[in-house]
Amino acid sequence: MSDSKEPRLQQLDLLEEEQLGGVGFRQTRGYKSLAGCLGHGPLVLQLLSFTLLAGLLVQVSKVPSSLSQGQSKQDAIYQNLTQLKVAVSELSEKSKQQEIYQELTRLKAAVGELPEKSKQQEIYEELTRLRAAVGELPEKSKLQEIYQELTRLKAAVGELPEKSKQQEIYQELSRLKAAVGDLPEKSKQQEIYQKLTQLKAAVDGLPDRSKQQEIYQELIQLKAAVERLCHPCPWEWTFFQGNCYFMSNSQRNWHDSITACQEVGAQLVVIKSAEEQNFLQLQSSRSNRFTWMGLSDLNHEGTWQWVDGSPLLPSFKQYWNKGEPNNVGEEDCAEFSGNGWNDDKCNLAKFWICKKSAASCSGDEERLLSPAPTTPNPPPA
């Protein structure tokens, strides 16, 4: 029995050595059979468990290192993001503050220079209304009167409390003073009027109502005085080259026509130039009227003479119509007829033309602030 057991034990030892030498189910002599392997199952499971445990320990040993590295990277990224956020926030706020400050500075400067829309419109309308009136102010004496008014206005403005407005109005008055000193051109007169209008607009914005009212009254008086400044001709008269002409709407004989003109400080028209002749001939032909002029040969037949005693110049004889004067039936007085002159009987009733010099607007200085003079009545029409 003992001899038989020993060979079996030797066989088992050889089998275990083969199993241990081929871990992972590999045998040097090849696989015996699936049943043989399963017969040694506990040993195989132990080997597998040992292998898995060793691999797990290796992996677990690596985890703290990778975790610590990831955490440090996260911390670094978070710190960088925080710093970047702060930097961007500061940069944005500073740039916006600078931009807003610059815009406010520009806006403040622009608003400080611009007047209100309503004031601009008021200035423009006032300027338009008075421009025509000031345009007829040709005399230096009248400009001097306006300058005196401006001087009084300047003194009143100087008492007002708002310094900035005082300075602005004072500068306007200074410019007005220089403009008035330069005199009668219409452009200068218009400039004066514009400055007066701007001054009125500036005064309207002042807080002191009593002073404002005082200055406003001065401006109203000055405006009225400018509007009353003399017109070259009375109403219903026509201005031409320094003279005024009245064309009647009724008819009289030649002698009564002379009287009608004298009653208004004029005379039956005496023609002095070719331009005047053309102007008067046009007026008469437009109305299709026969109109007396101040020319006759009553003193000496065939010698034509004006009512002021001056003779008819040879150059004017061209204005007679063809065949005239013919002195048919004692035709001793001249008239405008069609496109030229004609002689006719002096006792016939016709329209007439009066002539006198235009006003020079150089009367007393008191006229500026005195009531408007009454317009001379035209001769009976």
UniProtKB/Swiss-Prot annotation:
A GO term from the CC aspect: membrane
Binding site for Ca(2+): E324, N326, V328, E331, N342, D343
Role, per record: Pathogen-recognition receptor expressed on the surface of immature dendritic cells (DCs) and involved in initiation of primary immune response. Thought to mediate the endocytosis of pathogens which are subsequently degraded in lysosomal compartments. The receptor returns to the cell membrane surface and the pathogen-derived antigens are presented to resting T-cells via MHC class II proteins to initiate the adaptive immune response. Probably recognizes in a calcium-dependent manner high mannose N-linked oligosaccharides in a variety of pathogen antigens. On DCs it is a high affinity receptor for ICAM2 and ICAM3 by binding to mannose-like carbohydrates. May act as a DC rolling receptor that mediates transendothelial migration of DC presursors from blood to tissues by binding endothelial ICAM2. Seems to regulate DC-induced T-cell proliferation by binding to ICAM3 on T-cells in the immunological synapse formed between DC and T-cells.
Localisation: Membrane
Major subcellular location class: membrane
Disulfide bonds: C233-C244, C261-C354, C333-C346
Family annotation (Pfam families): Lectin_C
CDD domains reported in the protein's UniProt record: CLECT_DC-SIGN_like
Segments passing through the bilayer: 38-58
PROSITE patterns (alphabetical): C_TYPE_LECTIN_1 (PS00615), C_TYPE_LECTIN_2 (PS50041)
Keyword entries, A-Z: Adaptive immunity, Calcium, Cell adhesion, Disulfide bond, Endocytosis, Glycoprotein, Immunity, Innate immunity, Lectin, Mannose-binding, Membrane, Metal-binding, Receptor, Repeat, Signal-anchor, Transmembrane, Transmembrane helix
Renumbered residue ranges of the record's region Disordered: 360-381
Keyword Zinc: no
Region annotated 6 X approximate tandem repeats, chain positions: 96-303
Protein name: CD209 antigen
GO-annotated molecular function: D-mannose binding; metal ion binding
Gene it is expressed from: CD209
Start-end of each Sequence repeat: 96-118, 119-141, 142-164, 165-187, 188-210, 211-234
Membrane-side (Cytoplasmic) residue stretches: 1-37
Membrane topology: Single-pass type II membrane protein
Keyword Ion transport attributed: no
Cross-referenced InterPro entries: C-type_lectin-like (IPR001304), C-type_lectin-like/link_sf (IPR016186), C-type_lectin/snaclec_domain (IPR050111), C-type_lectin_CS (IPR018378), CD209-like_CTLD (IPR033989), CTDL_fold (IPR016187)
The record's note on its domains: The tandem repeat domain, also called neck domain, mediates oligomerization.
Species of origin: Macaca nemestrina (Pig-tailed macaque)
